[in-house]
Structure formats: C-alpha cells, structure tokens
C-alpha cells in the first residue's frame, strides 16, 4: 500500500470539491466579487474568537451563504456543513500568532486556522481566488479548467512512463525464464514502477480537486495502472533478501527523494544488496510475481511452492511428480501450473503483456 501523504489537505479538499454544496456557495461568492471569510466548525475554540454578528442556526444553502457574504463579517458553518451558525461576525484571533499574510481577511483566516486547527476559507475580493487554511497548511483552490488541463497533461506523461515500464518488465520476464536476471534489471524495474506510482499520486490529487468533474480522468487512470502497484510489490518480494520484510522495503522506496530514486545503488541497498555490482550480479526470482499470474493458483499454494523450490527457475524445471508432492498440489493442479507457466513463457516470447 502507498504511504498516506498530505491526508489533512486531502480530507479538506474532499468537502469542497466541485459538485459539493460548499463549493457551490464559494463559487457564488467568487463570481459576485464580494469576498468572504468562512469558518468550518462551531466548537468552543472557534466561538471564543467570535465577537458580534448574529446567530442564525439556519440550514445550509449555497444561496444563503452568498447573500450573507455581502456583509463584511465572517460566516461560521457547523462541522457537518448542515447549519449556518452565525453571520457578520468579527473574528478576534490571538495577535501573537505569526502569519506572513498581508490582507486583513487572510491574516485573520490564517491565525484562526492556526489557533483552532479548524478549516478557514478566505475569498479574496480583488484577486478573485479562494484560499483554504487548516492549522499550518495553506492551499489555494484552483479553477477546474486549470486543474483539468494539468490532469490531462499528467495522464499523457503517465502513458509514456507506463510504456517504458512495460518494456522494462517484458525484458525482465524474458530474463527470469532464462535465469539470466541481473541486479541492474531488477532495480531498474522497481525504479520505473515507483516513478509511475508517483505520477499516479499526483493525478489522484487532481481527481480529488476536480470532484465530480474528474470521472473521466479517474477512468483513464484506472485503465492505465490496473495491476502496476501489486506487481511492483511482488517484484520487491521476489528479490529482497530473506531477512528483509518486503512491505518495509516498499515503504523505504516510497520515502526516497526524487534524486535518490535515480540512484539505482540506493534501491539495491534497500533490497539488501549493499556493494554488489549491478550489472555483474546475477540474481534469481523467488517467483511470487510470475506464479501469481498462473490462473486459479491460491496464494497459499504459491507460498508452499516457493518454500519447497526456493527459486522460480526450479519450479519451471520441476516435473509433474516433483510438483505433485508439494502440499496443496495434486495431479490436476501440478498440470495446471506447468501449462500456465508454458503459456506465460509463450506470451513473453511473443512480447505480449502478461
């Protein structure tokens, strides 16, 4: 599984992406060029900063928010976004809280967000932008057309990276069946997989921001990267040293900086191959990835096969009787494994994706 990065901002964006009632209200204020200051949450910390205004406790509606924003004061909305608690309120945050914002509205929003850890939205009257604050986080909501253009550009980049990854994996598949895999081939495949997954993360952020307008991008993304992460994890499992936990190795690879990811030796070290020459070190796959592509073979049987034979090549060379004695494998399943591996090999030789 991917490490969860920027969860605070992701959770915040979910409640105000296009298609939501809150976003509709924000867009109305933006178009009216009135500006506005909205606080999400009516807990004690927030209400202690509120001075004046009038209490409403009215049901939330985008048109109500738009009308109330015509007044100078802030609007406080309940945590569940169902009630407008009060309007035209003056917010008085702790003046000692440091902020580098310049406008009065944005300085107040930043301080309130830091002081209460609630979501505060400042809508600029002159610059016509929506800025979201939560704790120390500041995020400027972009127009859907801008995000859509960037998302489409990212999808095009992803297509090229996936194409390169497929070539690298096809080459690795061929070498695995010939038992000629080098450490260089393995770390290159892992590097390329991680590069693809980082672009996927970026596109997922765009999809989150686009809300219901990001459906087509989401469909394209799912089609492009169906099993890439799963195969990448199995690749790490195939080649990391016995005493290494493959999920921990995957987490460490995700934590590599962009510059470190370009260093193949750094990836090799994480797999447990410190100081080994990449091109000259022959390395055999355990077989989790390839055996996982054989139809109707449970993961427990794959585990038993690898425990018995240690390497993929030994499984490939084993005859039916040798396969039959492995726990969980009868005559029918032994034949299915042999036939499945034969079909996979033929597909690889025809340079087809498996």
UniProtKB/Swiss-Prot annotation:
**Which ranges carry the DAC domain?**
6-144
Quickly give the catalysed reaction: 2 ATP = 3',3'-c-di-AMP + 2 diphosphate
* UniProt: ATP binding residues: 73, 91, 104-108
Could you list the residue ranges forming a coiled coil in this record? Answer: none
A GO molecular-function annotation: DNA binding
| PROSITE patterns in alphabetical order | DAC
Keywords of this protein's UniProt record, alphabetized?
Answer: ATP-binding, DNA damage, DNA repair, DNA-binding, Magnesium, Nucleotide-binding, Nucleotidyltransferase, Transferase
Give the cofactors, semicolon-separated: Mg(2+)
SUPFAM superfamilies recorded? RuvA domain 2-like, YojJ-like
Give its E.C. classification number: 2.7.7.85
Q: What class of enzyme is it?
A: transferase
Tell me a GO biological process for this protein.
DNA repair
The cross-references to Pfam families, in alphabetical order and at most eight, read: DAC, DisA-linker
Subunit composition and interactions: Homooctamer.
What does the UniProt function comment say about this protein?
A: Participates in a DNA-damage check-point that is active prior to asymmetric division when DNA is damaged. DisA forms globular foci that rapidly scan along the chromosomes during sporulation, searching for lesions. When a lesion is present, DisA pauses at the lesion site. This triggers a cellular response that culminates in a temporary block in sporulation initiation. Also has diadenylate cyclase activity, catalyzing the condensation of 2 ATP molecules into cyclic di-AMP (c-di-AMP). c-di-AMP acts as a signaling molecule that couples DNA integrity with progression of sporulation. The rise in c-di-AMP level generated by DisA while scanning the chromosome, operates as a positive signal that advances sporulation; upon encountering a lesion, the DisA focus arrests at the damaged site and halts c-di-AMP synthesis.
Q: Which family does it belong to?
A: Belongs to the DisA family.
**Record-linked HAMAP family:** DisA
Q: What is this protein called?
A: DNA integrity scanning protein DisA
Source species of the chain: Clostridium botulinum (strain Alaska E43 / Type E3)
Lineage of producing organism: Bacteria, Bacillati, Bacillota, Clostridia, Eubacteriales
């Amino acid at each position: 599984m991917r490490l969860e990065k920027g969860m605070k901002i992701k959770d915040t964006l979910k409640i105000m992406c296009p298609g939501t009632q809150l976003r509709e209200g924000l867009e109305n204020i933006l178009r009216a060029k009135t500006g506005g200051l909205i606080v999400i949450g009516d807990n004690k910390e927030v209400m202690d900063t509120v001075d004046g205004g009038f209490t409403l406790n009215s049901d939330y509606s985008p048109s109500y928010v738009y009308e109330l924003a015509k007044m100078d004061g802030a609007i406080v909305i309940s945590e569940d976004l169902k009630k407008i608690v009060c309007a035209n309120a003056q917010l008085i945050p702790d003046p000692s809280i440091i902020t580098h914002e310049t406008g009065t509205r944005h300085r107040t929003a930043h301080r309130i967000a830091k002081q209460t850890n609630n979501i505060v939205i400042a809508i600029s009257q002159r610059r016509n932008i929506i800025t979201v604050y939560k704790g120390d986080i500041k995020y400027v909501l972009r127009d859907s057309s801008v995000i859509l253009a960037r998302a489409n550009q990212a999808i095009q980049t992803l297509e090229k990276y996936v194409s390169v990854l497929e070539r690298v994996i096809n080459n690795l598949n061929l070498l695995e069946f010939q038992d000629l895999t080098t450490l260089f081939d393995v770390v290159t495949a892992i590097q390329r997989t991680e590069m693809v997954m980082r672009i996927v993360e970026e596109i997922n952020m765009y999809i989150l921001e686009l809300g219901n307008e990001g459906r087509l991008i989401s469909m394209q993304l799912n089609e492009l990267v169906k099993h890439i992460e799963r195969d990448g994890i199995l690749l790490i499992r195939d080649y990391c040293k016995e005493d290494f936990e493959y999920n921990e190795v995957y987490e460490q690879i995700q934590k590599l900086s962009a510059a470190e990811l370009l260093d193949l030796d750094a990836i090799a070290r994480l797999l447990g191959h410190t100081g080994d020459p990449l091109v000259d070190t022959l390395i055999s796959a355990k077989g989790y990835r390839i055996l996982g592509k054989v139809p109707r073979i449970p993961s427990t049987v794959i585990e038993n096969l690898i425990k018995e034979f240690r390497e993929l090549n030994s499984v490939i060379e084993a005859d039916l009787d040798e396969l039959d004695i492995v726990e969980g494998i009868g005559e029918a399943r032994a034949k299915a494994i042999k036939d499945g591996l034969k079909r996979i090999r033929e597909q690889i030789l025809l340079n087809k994706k498996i």
